Every structure is written in C-alpha cells, then in structure tokens.
Design a protein with these regions (language model features):
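Conserved HGGG/HGGXW glycine-rich cap/lid loop of the alpha/beta-hydrolase fold
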Residues: 9-83
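Conserved acidic catalytic loop of the alpha/beta-hydrolase fold
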Residues: 82, 90, 94-112
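Conserved hydrolase catalytic core segment
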Residues: 110-150
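Flexible "cap/lid" loop of the alpha/beta hydrolase fold
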Residues: 138-169
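Conserved alpha/beta-hydrolase catalytic His-Asp/Glu region
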Residues: 173-216
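Short beta-strand/loop motif that positions the catalytic acidic residue
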Residues: 235, 241-243
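Conserved alpha/beta-hydrolase "acid-adjacent" motif
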Residues: 248-254
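Catalytic active-site module of serine/aspartate enzymes centered on a nucleophile-bearing elbow/loop
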Residues: 265-294
Length: 294
C-alpha cells in the first residue's frame, strides 16, 4: 500500500495487476475501508485483465483528512453531528469524487472503469456525470441516488448506525459484539453470514484506522448532498446496477431508481442479498463487470 497527498488528503491506495492495461477503481462505502473489497474479488478482476485500484476514502482506514478541527471523542454521534453542521460542512461528496480524479492523475490513468458500493456508488454517479471523459463504465452496487422520494432506511438499522460505538480500547468485546450484530443484520437472508470473515475484517480495520469517528464527516457529506435527476441523466457510460432484495439501508427501489434514470443501464436485482457483498457473488459480479466492458 502507498500514500499520495491529494489536496488536504493523505490518500492510501493499493494497485493489483500493475501490468494490465484496463484500469478499474473500486470505491468503498460509508465508513468502509478498502479491505472490504474482498481480495478474491480483486484477483478475479486481475485475471480478467483489469488493473485494480483500491483506496480508502478520506476519513476511512489509513487515509487522513488533514483538518485542524478534530472530532470530539467524548460525545455521541448525534451531538457531534449537530455541532459540526453549525460550523459548515467539512467537505462534500463531490470533494470525495475529486479525490478519485486526483488518484487517477497521480497514477497517470486517463480513463478508468469505476465500481462503487453504497456511498461509493453515489461517488461513482458523480464521476460518471461530471467527469464523463474519465469514466469508461460504471458498476453501482447497493447504492442510491439519494432521491428524497425513495423509501427510507430501516429505522432499527438507522438507530444502530447512529448510536455511539463502544471504544475498543476500553470495551473491545462490546465493540466487536455491536459491529458483528450490525453486519449480520444487514447481510441478507440468502447467504450464510461468515462470522470468522467479519471478525478478521474488524480486527484489521482497527489496526488500519487513523481517524476516530471520521464517519461523522462522511455522514455530513451525504446529508448535505442535493439530489438532482439531471445528474443521472447526464451519465453516458455503460452502467450496471446491482442491488439486493434484502437491503435494509437502501431499499431495492433505490437501485431501480438509478437504473430508470441512467439511459441504457442494466439492472440486476439479487434475491436474498442485503447491504453487503457475500463471497458467493464474487464470481458472478466480476463476470458481469467483464461482460459490461468487453
């Protein structure tokens, strides 16, 4: 893994399949680190001829958003959220999209295929709309346009997402218990929840994390996003939309909304898939991406 300075961000990234000529950027979701893109999935894309670029979004994992305004560690998410909102939004989703462009510029990549999951799918939409000359194709997984008319997230899940997390340095067991419970809750009914995989990822995320509660600034970026249907209508790149029937964060109608708004896009509704990508779908999704671009 390497780090590059892009504006006020020290961005951590990793490239797989350096010698391949077709580049694909994988964009993670809210509070999610690049290691959530399963290494087997990355290797499958490499085998299909892709140079795979993974990175941590600002305020996630080993990527640091350099700011003098620290996030208080002794207050709940809602309290901090309210305080930061009054001071102004630290950055926008468009700033996060510009981080991707900065990374492509650093790597001297003129055009790339883009795949984003959850919030990363919104960033992918922004790239497809505002940087069409840089985007060869879009794969948008379990995401949303943030159209206010769409169904809201499950209330129980929203409560779990916004309640303060236990400090793992003080209550490691409580931290893991809550995180695992949440991950299992959103995983969907069609696939067996892999407890060992989730535990391993959580342990690695703790080791890699550089910013405590950085997710709050990402939430502010999402909360300040102004939906406009014109953004999706401007997308001209080939687009694949993948969404699960069991998604409790972004209802399946969110995926349908994107597909209805992006001309010529393909929609795949996956039975039993929740708001995560089970390993059982790695082959299928990598095949669909290859079919999209070949």
């Amino acid at each position: 893994m390497e780090t590059v300075k892009i504006g006020d961000v020290d961005l951590c990234y990793e490239v797989f399949g350096e010698k391949n000529t077709q580049s694909i950027v994988l964009i993670s979701g809210l509070g999610s680190q690049m290691i959530r893109w399963d290494i087997h999935f990355c290797n499958l894309l490499v085998e299909k001829g892709f140079k795979v670029i993974c990175f941590d979004n600002r305020d996630s994992g080993s990527t640091v958003f350099n700011t003098k305004k620290e996030i208080p560690s002794d207050k709940g998410i809602e309290e901090v959220f309210a305080a930061l909102s009054k001071e102004g939004i630290p950055y926008s989703l468009m700033d996060m999209a510009n981080d991707v462009i900065g990374l492509l510029n650093h790597l001297k990549i003129e055009k790339a295929h883009i795949a984003g999951r959850s919030m990363g799918g919104i960033i992918a939409q922004l790239l497809g709309s505002y940087y069409p000359e840089r985007v060869l194709s879009l794969t948008i997984i379990m995401s949303t346009s943030l159209n206010p008319a769409l169904p809201k997230p499950d209330p129980e899940i929203m409560a779990m997402m916004t309640q303060p997390a236990a400090d793992p340095s003080v209550d490691r067991e409580g931290y893991f218990r809550a995180k695992i419970h949440f991950a299992e809750k959103i995983s969907g009914s069609g696939y067996v929840f892999d407890l060992n995989q989730e535990t391993t990822l959580l342990e690695e995320e703790l080791t890699r994390s550089r910013t405590k509660n950085g997710i709050i600034r990402q939430l502010l970026a999402m909360g300040s996003f102004q939906y406009t249907p014109d953004m999706l209508k401007k997308i001209t790149a080939p687009a694949l939309i993948i969404h699960g029937t069991d998604d409790l964060i972004f209802h399946a109608d969110c995926g349908k909304d994107i597909a209805d708004s992006v001309s010529g896009s393909e929609l795949m509704i996956m039975e039993g898939m929740g708001h995560s990508i089970p390993r059982e779908l790695n082959d299928f999704i990598s095949d669909k991406i290859y079919d999209l671009v070949k």
